[in-house]
C-alpha cells in the first residue's frame, strides 16, 4: 500500500489531548530512530521502555529519552531464545496505559500490544527472508510482526515478506526513502569533529569490517587486505573494529595511516566528514549514502532489498575485491563528497505524517 505524504492533510484539527504512545527500544539503533521520529510527530506524549541490550540503554539516555528498562539480552544462544518470550511476557504485564504502541524490528512490542488490545505501528526494512532460504528465525520473526496493526516499510522493501505471512496488504504502508533518513534528518554536524582525529585535517575514509559472527555471513573477511590496500595508497583510515579480536586485521597496514579509536565515535559525524565510508554490513553504508557521502559495501552475503536498490542506483558501490575498492576510493575527488540533509528531512516529514495519520485512524481523530 503506497501512502503519499502529498495526498495527506498537513493541517490537523485541534485535539482534546495528546495521544499517548508507547515506544519500546529493543536494539541500539532504536533510540536515534524513535527520538527523531517522535520529535517530528505532532501532539503525542511518549512513554518509553528500553531493553538492556548492548548500548540501547546508554543511547536512549544520550538522546534524551526518559525511560524504564524492561528485560535484557543474553550472550548464550539458548538463554537468548528464552529471553525474548520472557521479555514479551514482561511487556504484556508492565506496558503502560496508552493509545498506540510503536516499535522497530520488534516482535516483542507487537505481541505485547496485541495481548493488551492496543493497536501497534511497526517499522522495518529487513526483508532477508525474500533473499535467503533456511533463515527460520527470521521467517518466524516476520510471521510475528505481520500481526502488527500497521507495518511501515520503505518502498524498496519486499512487502510479500509480510503479506505472505498473514499481514493484510492494506496494513502495510510504504514511504519514499529509507529508515536511515529519519534520524539522519535530525543530525547536526560538528565542524570541529575532524580535530579529534590524528590526521591534521587531511581527508580520511572509514572502514567497518564484516560481522563475521552473524548467521547470514558465510565468508572470510577482506578487512586486512583492504586496510593494507588503502594505506599503501596514502589514504588515511578510521578503522572501527567490532571487537578487540578485529584489531588484528590492521597489523599489516601502515600504522601512520590507520587509526582505531578506543572510545566510540559518532557514526554520523564520521559519515558526514569522511571522504568515503566502507563497511562490511549495511547500516553505515546507507547512512553515508543518504547524506550523499560516497559509500562502499563489501557485504559478503545476499543484500536486503534496501541495499540492493541503493547499489542499483549507484548510491552505494559494492565489491569484494580489496584492490578494486581501493582504486575506486583513490579515484574520488572532493566534489564527490558533498554531504547534505535536505533529502533525509523530506523523508522524515513523510514518515512522521504517515505515522500521525495511522495514529489518528486508530484513535478516531479527524484531521
Predicted regions and their residues:
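Donor nucleotide-activated moiety binding/catalytic core segment of transferases
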Residues: 82-91, 244-284
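A nucleotide-sugar donor-handling region in carbohydrate enzymes
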Residues: 2, 148-219
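Conserved nucleotide-sugar phosphate-binding/catalytic loop shared by glycosyltransferases and other
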Residues: 25, 42-83
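Catalytic donor nucleotide-activated moiety binding site of glycosyltransferases and closely related
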Residues: 53, 63-74, 207-209, 227-261
